[in-house]
Structures are given as C-alpha cells and as structure tokens.
C-alpha cells in the first residue's frame, strides 16, 4: 500500500508489532495537544461535521458518543450479470447466473433501519443492547444518557481522559472496551451521553461474514 501523505495536523505513529486498541488510544491521547480526544474504529463511517456537533454540547465531565447505525460497507458484484450480493464472505457463485467471478463495490453508507442510541452491560460486564430504553420519556430528546456503549467510538475532553487513567491496558487489548469506558464515565461522577444530533456507522462482521469458522 502507498504510504500515508504527510499533513502538518496529522501525526502517524508506527509500531513494529500490534499493541491493541487500548494502548493505541492511550498513545494517541498522550501525543495530542488538542482540547478533545475522539476515538473511532477503522471500520466506521461518520456524519459530516460530527466533531463540531459534539463540541457544541460536550460538558467537561461528559463522555459522548454519536447515535449509531450499522454500516453498509460494500457489496459483491457479479462480473457476469452484474447482480450484487450484500456484504460478507465472497460468494462462491452468483445465484443469478452461476458466475464465479465477483468484484467488491464500495457502498459506505449507514443502514437507516439499524439505529441504536442506548446500551448497557450486565452483572458479568457483558455488553448488551438496551432497546427498551429508547421508548422511555427521558430518551426522547437530542441528548440521551445511556449506561454503556459498544466502545467503537467516543468523544471527551482530553484532560478528562487522562485524569481517568486512559484505557486500562492490563485489562487486555480489546474486550469490554465499552464497559470500561462507560463505567469510568459515571463512576467518576460524570455522564455517558448519546447525541442524536450526529451519528457514526459501524461495520458488524457477523452473520454472512463467517463461513466454516472463518471470517
């Protein structure tokens, strides 16, 4: 792949070995001199002007997350008949013409029918969707307090992130990221807030992304 082009406002940090997203987030926050820190998984899309919309409402003791869609990242297009198959494992053959040649077509759009604003975790720190919460009166405004998040994306003042100790690298590189983030938000006296004024879309690599135990 070609190298990333230089930009005076972008600092690329290289590691010989993968260090995991907890450590990577900590390194980025430590190197930054910005007022805010925003963490986003690579397999995500964001709303235009998402940062400005979050800054307008962010309070010093808040951790904020955009409302979330599922991401329609790509389709598989049959090179023979042009039929397209929804993202996932590359089809072995086209169901329309039995052709075996396919090319990836980038879509990169949110799926409107897959929308979430609230999450929680159980007594085992296991992440859960909180579907019923979105119907409560307190969840009808543009800013909604939620118990947890999936951990793919968050926004807060950088000094608060550092004061909370960043992400706990002793807890592993990946698992329970959202549970740790949310627990630190409200156990420190702050809040975890979903903003409906903006959104992010996350690619969930489940379902037809898996075949014969591989994804």
Predicted regions and their residues:
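Conserved donor NDP-sugar-binding/catalytic core segment of glycosyltransferases
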Residues: 45, 49-122
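A recurrent flexible, glycine/aromatic-enriched loop bordering the glycosyltransferase active site
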Residues: 22, 132-155
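A short, conserved alpha-helix in the catalytic core of glycosyltransferases
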Residues: 54, 153-154, 159-165, 170-198
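Acidic donor-binding segment of Leloir-type glycosyltransferases
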Residues: 1-15
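Acidic metal-phosphate-binding loop of nucleotide-sugar-dependent transferases
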Residues: 42-46, 171
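Glycine-rich, basic loop-to-helix element that forms the pyrophosphate-binding segment
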Residues: 15-32
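Catalytic beta-strand/loop signature of glycosyltransferases that borders the donor
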Residues: 67, 191-204, 214
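Short aromatic/hydrophobic "clamp" motif used to bind/position activated sugar donors
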Residues: 37
